[in-house]
Amino acid sequence: CAPSMAWRVVDADHAFKHAVSKGATPYEGDGKALDVPAIVGIGGSLLYFVEKYGDKGSAYENEFEWLGEANPKPEGVGFYFLDHLTHNVYRGNMDKWWAFYRELFGFTQIHFFDIEGKLTGLVSRAITSPCGKIRIPLNESTDDKSQIESYLKKYRGEGIQHIAVGTDGIYDATDKLAANGLKFMPGPPETYYEMSHERVQGHEEPIERMKK
């Protein structure tokens, strides 16, 4: 899980004070990754407000010492933005966290799913910030055997379960990750690829490259 996240804002102090005035809990303890205003978010994780970015420089310049062998501005492999980050919440808490983002930051709902499988089920509410750049699916299990429930037990609480990154060329980008030594999760069974044209008719994805 991720222990914190940071949002880029125009005025960090204003964003922090606004959130606290709406009921957010300010974080005033030790151990912050950045010396910027922060509130307590999902599962006790921190939500930082960062105003130093772009032409203003980087919020991390004064927090980390770059080593000689590290490049502070690496070329990267082709991932350019965060598409979304998912929260796993306890049963009955989805409305609580939906209200947290709605009341504090003006988020709106873009999708709602009630998925019932053969063995497990879940409810998912996808929400987005007013600017559309921050998307958060809130996931809540409907049984004791789901992946969400396993996460909550292993992590011992709610939290950020995964992040999804965006790219213009997913095959080239993932090939570069593999070349850099990243190990991927096991792929889906062969039937996933065999049935792909039935599920998504007319798709032109290169099946053999997908299998890699």
Predicted regions and their residues:
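Short, flexible, solvent-exposed loop/turn segments with mixed acidic/basic and small polar residues
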Residues: 74-77, 150-155
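Eukaryotic phosphotyrosine signaling hubs
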Residues: 2-3, 160
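A short, polar/proline- and glycine-enriched secondary-structure boundary/capping micro-motif
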Residues: 59-61, 147-150
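Conserved secondary-structure micro-motifs at functional edges
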Residues: 138-149
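Vicinal oxygen chelate
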Residues: 4-83, 87-89, 94, 111-140, ...
